[in-house]
Amino acid sequence: MKRFLDRRTILAVAVLILAPLLWFAPVILGGKTLIPADNLYQFQPWASLAGQYGVGVPHNELLSDLVLENFVWKSFLREAISTGQLPLWNPHLFTGVPFLAAGQHSALYPLSIVFYILPLPLAYGVFTWLQLAVAALGMYVFGRALRLGRAASAFAGLAYAFSGFFVVSVVFTMIIAAAAWLPWLLACIETIVRKQEEKGDVAYSPIPYVLGGAVVLGLQALAGHPEIVVITLLVAGFYSLLRLLVLWRRIGALGRAARLAGWLLVLVVIGIALGAIQIVPLF
């Protein structure tokens, strides 16, 4: 416990949480928003009012999905929740379409609570900050699981959270929400295998780490971007195979490696089951 509560660890965690806050301070603290509202003026009826309101060329017309879809989804969710309704059906498109089953609105994702309690222009900034912090902390934990030093792990966390992928995806909330959990899952896998390496041919129960990894995978499934879940499972599968082969070579016990492989499959099954409330209706 002392290892996780010393001052250097607390400092590293604080930096990883505050760095995204500093980056998005104009949105969270300065009254700005990530919602590209100016993109609406490319379309009627708003285009007819562009001159009247002094709206010129949009800052980035490729980001229209956020204001045309995601913002509308979040508004519909808030409306449904305020009236005590479960938003199973969207009556506003043609004769109506399934809504909750669609998934990309992230309605069931725990951190989406910020969209239900904060004004939407502010909520997008707060949500993005929290997700980048989750991503940074996850990579820090993965680095520590690999026995990297605190500084190296913190640098890895910053590099991941501020990577090109996250930077260009900040306006796609479901993408960053899902991708943020990848290093947490890898950290669970690494811990499960490394503990067996430390114990050699002596059996141990990895249940706490299996359950932790399952929760991580379930959260990722609820985030609303199944493509990221598929990519995560591929990465986790290849990483698990590599680590199990290394484990077999180091301790020379094929049975122990096979046993851990079974536990990792249990992790995936439980994780998918936790996210099934969103996955099953989607398909």
Predicted regions and their residues:
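Membrane-interface starts of transmembrane alpha-helices
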Residues: 7-11, 115, 119-127, 148-156, ...
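Membrane-embedded helix bundles of polyisoprenyl
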Residues: 16, 134-146, 150-196, 201, ...
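Membrane-interface coil-to-helix junctions
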Residues: 20-139, 158-180
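Transmembrane helix-loop junctions and nearby membrane-interface residues
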Residues: 24-31, 117, 244-248, 279, ...
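Short loop/turn hinge sites at secondary-structure boundaries
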Residues: 30-31, 84, 195-200, 248-252
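Short secondary-structure boundary segments
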Residues: 3-4, 98-104, 220-230
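Helix-boundary and loop/linker segments of multi-pass membrane transporters
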Residues: 5, 202-206, 253-257
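Start-transfer (signal-anchor) and selected internal transmembrane alpha helices
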Residues: 1-26, 40-49, 259-264, 268
